[in-house]
């Protein structure tokens, strides 16, 4: 075997690895990437701004947002829905006017055809032996009647000259679907209302440190009951009555026994315990999906 046969480009088979590599480089097909720790947000960061929250609120599904960011998002969505609804109503009115115009034109054609048939009726008997009787009417008042024979095939082959400006086909506007009036959560896609947002109160590790000092620390908050450190590796939950953040271990071992909020003393239900969606640690065992996918056009032979 010569040296050329040992090169990586000398294979006669297009391997699976080469196909995946070329697909990723071309940009076609579904693109997959495994997220690293640098691409994962912290548990106390907003899902929109990806920054530590100053006034955090949580949705019933456990997604944390900055109050200002999520309210601005809801306001923007309502404006967008109003704009889409206005465009939909405008197109609907235009289509209704077009249908009325078509019905009016069809009615006029029907009346015109009826008048043409009425004017072609002969009021006196004709002599079958005269030349006028052969044509049915006088040469001066002759009306073109409908053809009795089969339709001409030449007319079917005649196509409109689409390159002439008067015969250029008109592009129809895209039909708009009626937009939904429901504002959805940007993360879960479920309906979201301002009344569904629950204020969250984190317990700082050191109450003497200001907010700027907390941001620079890796461990900023602790459980409101057990004082355990909170991080992406610690599953935690929010208690709806008080907004306190506690670990799931505390919920299972302490809170679920009496179902009482340890901060305010209010009775709790399963709906009042909101599991906080954390970003994960970057490891597969953290229980968080770390595989991102993006659908792209597919090139097929």
Curated annotation (Swiss-Prot):
EC number: 2.3.2.27
Keyword Phosphoprotein found: yes
Keyword annotations: Cytoplasm, Developmental protein, Nucleus, Phosphoprotein, Transferase, Ubl conjugation pathway
Ranges for region Disordered: 131-155
Subcellular location, principal: cytoplasm
Subcellular location(s) per record: Cytoplasm; Nucleus
Region (U-box-like): 55-75
Keyword rRNA-binding: no
CC per GO annotation: cytoplasm; nucleus
CDD domains: RING-Ubox1_NOSIP, RING-Ubox2_NOSIP
Assigned protein family: Belongs to the NOSIP family.
Function: E3 ubiquitin-protein ligase that is essential for proper development of the forebrain, the eye, and the face. Catalyzes monoubiquitination of serine/threonine-protein phosphatase 2A (PP2A) catalytic subunit PPP2CA/PPP2CB. Negatively regulates nitric oxide production by inducing NOS1 and NOS3 translocation to actin cytoskeleton and inhibiting their enzymatic activity.
Subunit structure: Interacts with NOS1 and NOS3. Interacts with PP2A holoenzyme, containing PPP2CA, PPP2CB, PPP2R1A and PPP2R2A subunits.
Protein name: Nitric oxide synthase-interacting protein
Organism classification: Eukaryota, Metazoa, Chordata, Craniata, Vertebrata
Gene behind the chain: NOSIP
